[in-house]
């Protein structure tokens, strides 16, 4: 078993400011431990006080309040440099022949590290995981050769996920192009082909909102499991029970991102067993159209006029059901389904493979502590 070492013996804090304003790439940091373009309003802000981060340096946010069970920490590996908020702590590994930054970042991805950081955060108004606490973290530091092997295994899995994500995006774009070619391009809504008509979403979709059920965090804690628990935009949790089993489309009901910057509704195409709370409408195609058709058609819709509420934007069921869509003939729909179902079969295979690979990554992270 590898001996545990004190992290502070391998890292040092870095505090370089953007005095010459040469670095303009402003990044934020998420609890998913990834850097992302900052959405902060920087008009009139003195960017010379921001901290500079170089490739292979790490950044963390000491304030762990309001971030759930995770700590925001990341390794800059996709950019040569960037700038971050003055509130962030920048640090680096002092000797890459003793500890690889990539290996260290793998340790930070472990849920055990998040629990450790939350437990060792202090403060009343704000909970802080300070620099001294970070330095006191104990971790196994195997030989540099073994570290490289572990990192290589993890990055092989990460690269496979990346390739699958590219394939998923390509398949979805292909399905959307097929939809547009069949039902949008060169189609005159005032003079539709024989057997086609304009109808409403409520006519062609089965809404299953009556089956959904919200569960509070306290209600979910004793029933943790493998089934996804979905909210308006994504998976919120995993529990040991499910309501739905099959292929469905979730249509975001409320929240700040109920529509995107182009006015399109927030959608989630799902299959398998899962639970949904009351922040997303649950739809399926009926005997007229397929669920895949609904997905492609609704991605084209501008739903801006359907949103109500200022403090809490919302698209209620009545407004959603009023969306007007082209309803093609059965022959055209059958032909479309034959082609699009093949596309989505590959889409599902790639997505499910990513889930399995993610499980392998979790196992690899777990083995680091053994």
Give, region by region, the residue ranges found by the protein language model:
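Non-catalytic DNA-recognition/assembly elements of restriction-modification systems
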Residues: 1-18, 136, 140-215, 219-231, ...
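Sequence-specific dsDNA recognition surfaces
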Residues: 4-60, 202-250, 255-277, 282
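Short, solvent-exposed loop/turn elements at beta->coil junctions and helix N-caps
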Residues: 76-77, 123-124, 189, 217-219, ...
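His/acidic/aromatic-lined binding-pocket segments of jelly-roll/cupin-type domains
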Residues: 49-51, 57-58, 296, 340-347
